[in-house]
C-alpha cells in the first residue's frame, strides 16, 4: 500500500499532538478511529455520567469517519473500554441508541483506569467503505 492510499484526520485533541497519533486513519476500504473519550479540547463532557460520556465519545468518532465521507451505517466494529463494570448498562443503552440499526460487532472491556480519572469510557470505531445492510 502506498502512502497516498493512507489518509489521516486530527480532531484537535491535545493528546494527538503530545503522543503523535491521528484521530482516524483511512487505509483502503477501512477507516479506524483511535480510542476516543468525551474530551473536546480540554473540557470533559458528561463528568460522572457514563451514558453521556459514551454518547459524546461516539459522536466524536462518528465525526471522524464523516471526514472520509462515511456515516454511522458504515460502522462495522466498536470497542468500548469502561472504568467500572457497574456502568455497563448505561454504556450499553447509549451504544444501542446509536448503533441498533447498524449492529456492528462490539467488544466491551473493563480496564484498570484512564489517564484522567474522570474518564469513565473510551471508544474505538472501525468503518468500512463497502458496508451494506443485510
Curated annotation (Swiss-Prot):
A Pfam cross-reference name: Ribonuc_L-PSP
InterPro entries: RutC-like_sf, YjgF/YER057c/UK114
PANTHER family recorded: BLR7761 PROTEIN, YJGH FAMILY PROTEIN
Protein name listed in UniProt: Uncharacterized protein SCO2049
Source species of the chain: Streptomyces coelicolor (strain ATCC BAA-471 / A3(2) / M145)
